[in-house]
């Protein structure tokens, strides 16, 4: 069954550029799982450099990065070495070698036309629940800043049980859940931060 937003992330044990890993061993941590169409491709190379340049920021947020494509582990190794040689960048996170496409199919990542993995992103919370998923066109590189913003928004919700409004940035107000009864809606009328009975901002 394909991955579903808000449901448990399908578990897997796979070989990677850093050896075997099992997703369930990451329980208790935030995970960013992202797929790319192929090694030695221009857009993917810029993305892996960009992810690496922000790797410390992900680590400070307690987020583990895991890459994925259907290339072999030998292809991953050669690509990592090539990036090191030409850009001076050491890729610090594992890249799954999903040559049998098992994980890619579980996460609905296969482009049926090309047979390659699409440019997907999944944020998995410490309970192994898929909290965010998005697919980018093959021609469009990912915005790392936006991915980090979404992680911070999800962690804000995790910590404070507040939603985030449009264009939210860290440090800005969150939104309390709307009242679920008529009586509680009237009680809210004079509270600080209330714009209307169903919309209350909280710092």
UniProtKB/Swiss-Prot annotation:
Enzyme class: oxidoreductase
Subcellular location: Cytoplasm
Organism: Thermoplasma volcanium (strain ATCC 51530 / DSM 4299 / JCM 9571 / NBRC 15438 / GSS1)
Gene Ontology terms for molecular function: thioredoxin peroxidase activity
Database matches in InterPro entries: AhpC/TSA (IPR000866), Peroxiredoxin (IPR050217), Peroxiredoxin_AhpC-typ (IPR024706), Peroxiredoxin_C (IPR019479), Peroxiredoxin_TDXH (IPR022915), PRX_1cys (IPR045020), Thioredoxin-like_sf (IPR036249), Thioredoxin_domain (IPR013766)
Protein name: Peroxiredoxin
Swiss-Prot/TrEMBL GO biological process terms: cell redox homeostasis; cellular response to stress; hydrogen peroxide catabolic process; response to oxidative stress
Any one cellular-component term (Gene Ontology): cytosol
Main location: cytoplasm
Catalysed reactions listed for this entry: a hydroperoxide + [thioredoxin]-dithiol = an alcohol + [thioredoxin]-disulfide + H2O
């Amino acid at each position: 069954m394909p991955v579903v937003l808000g449901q448990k992330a399908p578990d897997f044990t796979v070989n990677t550029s850093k050896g075997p890993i099992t997703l369930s061993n990451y329980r208790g941590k935030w995970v960013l799982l992202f797929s790319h169409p192929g090694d030695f491709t221009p857009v993917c190379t810029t993305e892996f450099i960009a992810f690496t340049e922000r790797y410390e920021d992900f680590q400070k947020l307690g987020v583990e990065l895991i890459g994925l494509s259907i290339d072999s582990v030998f292809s991953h190794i050669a690509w990592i070495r090539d990036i090191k040689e030409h850009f001076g960048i050491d890729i610090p996170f594992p890249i799954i070698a999903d040559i049998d496409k098992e994980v890619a199919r579980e996460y609905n990542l296969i482009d049926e036309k090309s047979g390659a993995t699409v440019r997907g992103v999944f944020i998995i919370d410490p309970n192994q629940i898929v909290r965010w998923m998005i697919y980018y066109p093959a021609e469009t590189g990912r915005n790392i800043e936006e991915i980090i913003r979404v992680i911070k928004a999800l962690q804000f919700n995790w910590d404070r049980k507040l939603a985030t409004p449009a264009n939210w940035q860290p440090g800005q107000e969150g939104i309390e859940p709307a009242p679920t009864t008529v009586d509680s809606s009237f009680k809210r009328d004079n509270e600080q931060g209330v714009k209307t009975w169903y919309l209350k901002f909280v710092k």
